[in-house]
UniProtKB/Swiss-Prot annotation:
Protein's organism: Pseudanabaena tenuis (strain PCC 7409)
Assembly information from the UniProt record: Heterodimer of an alpha and a beta subunit, which further assembles into trimers and the trimers into hexamers.
Family per similarity comment: Belongs to the phycobiliprotein family.
Keywords recorded for this protein, A-Z: Antenna complex, Bile pigment, Chromophore, Electron transport, Membrane, Photosynthesis, Phycobilisome, Thylakoid, Transport
Pfam families: Phycobilisome
Membrane topology reported for the UniProt record: Peripheral membrane protein
The record's account of how the chain is modified after translation: Contains one covalently linked bilin chromophore.
Name the UniProt record assigns to this protein: C-phycocyanin-1 alpha subunit
Domain of life: Bacteria
Amino acid sequence: MKTPLTEAVSAADSQGRFLSSTAVQVAFGRFRQATSGLAAAKALSEKADSLASGARNAVYSKFPYTTSMTGANYASTQTGKDKCVRDIGYYIRMVTYCCVVGGTGPMDDYLVAGIAEINRTFDLSPSWYVEALKYVKANHGLSGDSAVEANSYIDYAINALS
């Protein structure tokens, strides 16, 4: 999994050199930032169920037709509604992973690379997940550096879907 720190170490190692002073400063900056990222990940994890449920309702409010579309991938049944919450929870989980590692590596590796194909295969609209992520961003209750950290990865996911 790629993070700014693992990339710096990998580059230095492949060139047979020590980390540059700039890379070391980046590492110290990440360690200072880590507290905020871990706090954001903890708070989002604790609120994941309620955030996912609220985000689902925000999607249904903006796109009411999704609750009447029939099929295994839509919200006309309880199974469809449960899948929606599960999928939104997956996005929240990816944001928490990014907060922990301090980079977009988890999202790049496990979400962004195949999201267009998944959405196309299951006839899912990226705009639904964009709306869900906007809800999460507006309602996560974080503040200060923790909010900045989480919001940057939420925005990254939104941009990947757009």
